[in-house]
Amino acid sequence: MFGFLKQVGDYTRDAVDAARNLAQGFSVTFDHMQRRPVTVQYPYEKLIPSERYRGRIHYEFDKCIACEVCVRVCPINLPVVDWVMNKATKKKELRNYSIDFGVCIFCGNCVEYCPTNCLSMTEEYELAAFDRHSLNYDNVALGRLPTSVTTDPSVVPLRELAYLPAGEMDPHGVASDRPRAGQLPAQVLETLTPPAKPTAKNDGQSSSEAKEGDA
């Protein structure tokens, strides 16, 4: 008899624990259901990188003096500097400069120690390619300035979509009753788009119709 009661008590305790754990899991799920979406719809939306973001390296051929400081400070000796000695001027003459971004760790040492500031970090991070050899950028490819996220016409930044009300930086700290909170990008654009103005053709038609009515 006591064994049966003990089994019933253990079963009841296990059932209560299971219900409590299930309720805790659902509470976390319901809490996230009340929050607005924060997923960036890449590539149509992009986050603006920080000012000190270490992206693809930009290289200025005219400033380089072929000192090879970037090669010495690189942890993996990555930059390849091709130069010849000009016997007339007794100075190095740069022929080619290349960096393989398939191997680069973007530590920024080359940019930090360059004496002529011919190297700089950009905000470009889209370096995916089907062929790893195409990631080996020469001085021509390194000299191209990337298109900024803020000026790319194919990208609408999150700030322009007005996901967050003015003055708000934390997406989870915004009340659900605030204007535009939790709306989709299409809905936000509808609220921001001004109404269409009547064209001159329509105005002419309306004026002619009014004259006919007066006649």
From Swiss-Prot:
Membrane topology summary: Peripheral membrane protein
Q: Does the UniProt entry include the keyword Signal?
A: no
Q: Which keywords accompany this UniProt record?
A: 4Fe-4S, Iron, Iron-sulfur, Membrane, Metal-binding, NAD, NADP, Plastoquinone, Quinone, Repeat, Thylakoid, Translocase
Q: Name one GO cellular component term.
A: plasma membrane-derived thylakoid membrane
Q: Which InterPro entries match?
A: 4Fe4S_Fe-S-bd (IPR017896), 4Fe4S_Fe_S_CS (IPR017900), NADH_quinone_OxRdtase_chainI (IPR010226), NDHI (IPR004497)
The residues forming a coiled coil are none
Localization? Cellular thylakoid membrane
Which cofactor is recorded for it? [4Fe-4S] cluster
Residue ranges, annotated region (Disordered): 169-215
First-level EC class:
translocase
What EC number is given for this enzyme? 7.1.1.-
Q: How is the cofactor bound?
A: Binds 2 [4Fe-4S] clusters per subunit.
Its BP terms in the Gene Ontology are: photosynthesis, light reaction
- Name the positions where [4Fe-4S] cluster 2 binds: 74, 104, 107, 110
Residues bound to [4Fe-4S] cluster 1 are 64, 67, 70, 114
Its family remark reads:
Belongs to the complex I 23 kDa subunit family.
Primary role: NDH-1 shuttles electrons from an unknown electron donor, via FMN and iron-sulfur (Fe-S) centers, to quinones in the respiratory and/or the photosynthetic chain. The immediate electron acceptor for the enzyme in this species is believed to be plastoquinone. Couples the redox reaction to proton translocation, and thus conserves the redox energy in a proton gradient.
Question: Which HAMAP family does the entry mention?
Answer: NDH1_NuoI
Q: What is this protein called?
A: NAD(P)H-quinone oxidoreductase subunit I
* Provenance organism: Synechococcus sp. (strain CC9605)
Taxonomic lineage from the root:
Bacteria, Bacillati, Cyanobacteriota, Cyanophyceae, Synechococcales
